[in-house]
Amino acid sequence: VISIVDYGMGNLRSVEKGFASQGIEVRVTEDPGDIEGSSGLVLPGVGAFGDCVRNLRERSMTGPIKDFIASGRPFLGICLGFQVLFESSEEAPGEEGLGIFGGKVVRFCVAEKKLKVPHMGWNRVSAPEQTRILEGIPQQSWFYFVHSYHVVSDEPGADVLLSDYGGEFEAGVISGNLSAFQFHPEKSSDYGLMILRNFSKLCLEN
């Protein structure tokens, strides 16, 4: 079964509905014990980096999430669930992220380009070729974003997705069993839902 991690904040229901619309059964769980028995794990999230890592820690989910990722089973991070995979964020000085990936999260500096923060709405994404999670999705497809901070990764072996908002930024990272995106697949129409379908196929193969 695919589990969606409930840590008290985030876009859980919209992610759950996204999977359901594709006929994919998932469970939303706040029990760390459910993580180990999952075939796939989804970490969604909207909100603040510091609140997220504190909630995960207080609910004893940090260790099980790291163990799950290390097991090689499919993992999907969405929005804030993408950012917390990194080491730190300017949004929460002194708070450590999960540290799965090297790198940090920084605030958009786009005022001089007359752009608003948060970056909100549809934007094009360029993606690496031949990754299973993005199978069937053309280059420069549109995806839906809502975020004020963006990732600056230090992960040389990973495939990186790119978008542009007053300059190029990282819209996602794919590395082995782990796929994580700044945009919201569940809100990104057909191509976003295709990501959820591709993820479920990977889970079935597991």
Please annotate each region the language model reported.
Residues I2-I24, P185-E186:
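N-terminal beta1-alpha1 ligand-phosphate binding loop
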Residues G47-M120:
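Cysteine-nucleophile active-site neighborhood
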Residues F181-N206:
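Acyltransferase
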Residues S88-Y165:
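Pocket-forming structural segment of enzyme catalytic cores
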Residues G167-I174:
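Short, surface-exposed beta-strand/loop micro-motifs that present aromatic residues
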Residues P74-L76, W142, N177:
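Proline-centered loop/turn at the N-terminus of a beta-strand
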Residues S38:
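An anion/phosphate-binding loop that grips the pyrophosphate of nucleotide cofactors and donors
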